[in-house]
């Protein structure tokens, strides 16, 4: 079930403070965060946010089409290496 509209979007306070500070300076430095649960708000457009995926920080450049989604959606936590091919050279009939 989606979040109630009267509550508004959830953004961690420490992340919002970092975004506000970057907007006040007018710079677009990379903002490092562990908050995958924070929702992308219009203040973040144009910033690069490094979202933690469990072992490293994945840089995510925020565009206007991402508003309303969560940061964790853009930093996958699982690496898919494909299915292992079966080795038939050693098999005998």
UniProtKB/Swiss-Prot annotation:
Residue ranges with Basic and acidic residues bias: 9-23
RNA-binding among keywords: yes
GO biological process: ribosomal small subunit assembly; translation
Pfam families tied to this protein: Ribosomal_S19
Stretches for region Disordered: 1-23
GO cellular component terms given for this protein: cytoplasm; small ribosomal subunit
Alphabetical UniProt keywords: Ribonucleoprotein, Ribosomal protein, RNA-binding, rRNA-binding
Domain of life assignment: Bacteria
PANTHER family membership: RIBOSOMAL PROTEIN S19P FAMILY MEMBER (PTHR11880), SMALL RIBOSOMAL SUBUNIT PROTEIN US19M (PTHR11880:SF8)
Family, similarity comment: Belongs to the universal ribosomal protein uS19 family.
Protein name: Small ribosomal subunit protein uS19
Gene this protein is translated from: rpsS
């Amino acid at each position: 079930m989606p979040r109630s509209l009267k509550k508004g979007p959830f953004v961690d306070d420490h992340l919002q403070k970092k975004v506000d500070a970057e907007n006040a300076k007018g710079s677009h430095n990379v903002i490092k965060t562990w908050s995958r649960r924070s929702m992308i708000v219009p203040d973040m457009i144009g910033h690069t946010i490094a979202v933690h995926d469990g072992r490293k920080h994945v840089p995510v450049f925020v565009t206007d089409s991402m508003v309303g989604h969560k940061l964790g959606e853009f930093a996958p936590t699982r690496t898919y290496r494909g299915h292992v091919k079966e080795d038939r050279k050693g098999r005998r009939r």
